[in-house]
């Protein structure tokens, strides 16, 4: 069997196709979660905290001789900063995404349990039992 034929068989197997679909849907779903976090949740959190832009939250670790206040300006000047705002946004994003995936998996597991088990097929009668039945029936005659 040639390598191209093997690749075709691999590519059209269910697992490879399921993985491809999952990656595509996951990418689109990630954008939805980014929008929920960035456009809905973080503005509410920033309203409570008092900061509108979390990505601009940081601590200056080095000397700041020019008294720069913007994170981009500090980084451009080469001043050491501990930028935790972007991390907070990404952390909230991750927690929401993980919770949604958990709920989806939980629902899928519940649906699997609810499906009735297919009735087991009766196993084929062994040959020796068939032979014994045939002998018994012959003796009855």
UniProtKB/Swiss-Prot annotation:
GO MF term list: mechanosensitive monoatomic ion channel activity
State where the protein is found.
Cell inner membrane
Which ranges does the record mark as transmembrane? Answer: 21-41, 85-105
Give the residue range of the signal peptide: none
Q: What Pfam families does the database record attribute to this sequence?
A: MscL
Ion transport as a keyword of this entry, yes or no, is yes
**Keywords from the named record:** Cell inner membrane, Cell membrane, Ion channel, Ion transport, Membrane, Transmembrane, Transmembrane helix, Transport
PANTHER family in the record: LARGE-CONDUCTANCE MECHANOSENSITIVE CHANNEL (PTHR30266:SF2), MECHANOSENSITIVE CHANNEL MSCL (PTHR30266)
Q: What is this protein called?
A: Large-conductance mechanosensitive channel
* Source species taxonomy: Bacteria, Pseudomonadati, Pseudomonadota, Betaproteobacteria, Rhodocyclales
């Amino acid at each position: 069997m040639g390598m191209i034929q093997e690749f075709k068989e691999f590519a059209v197997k269910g697992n490879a196709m399921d993985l491809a679909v999952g990656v595509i849907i996951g990418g689109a779903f990630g954008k939805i979660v980014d929008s929920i976090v960035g456009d809905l949740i973080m503005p509410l959190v920033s309203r409570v905290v008092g900061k509108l832009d979390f990505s601009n939250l940081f601590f200056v670790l080095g000397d700041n001789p020019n008294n720069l206040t913007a994170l981009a300006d500090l980084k451009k000047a080469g001043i050491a900063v501990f930028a935790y705002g972007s991390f907070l946004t990404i952390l909230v994003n991750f927690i929401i995404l993980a919770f949604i995936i958990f709920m989806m998996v939980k629902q899928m597991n519940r649906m699997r349990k609810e499906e009735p088990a297919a009735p087991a097929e009766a196993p084929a009668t062994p040959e020796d039992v068939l032979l014994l039945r045939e002998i018994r029936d012959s003796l009855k005659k």
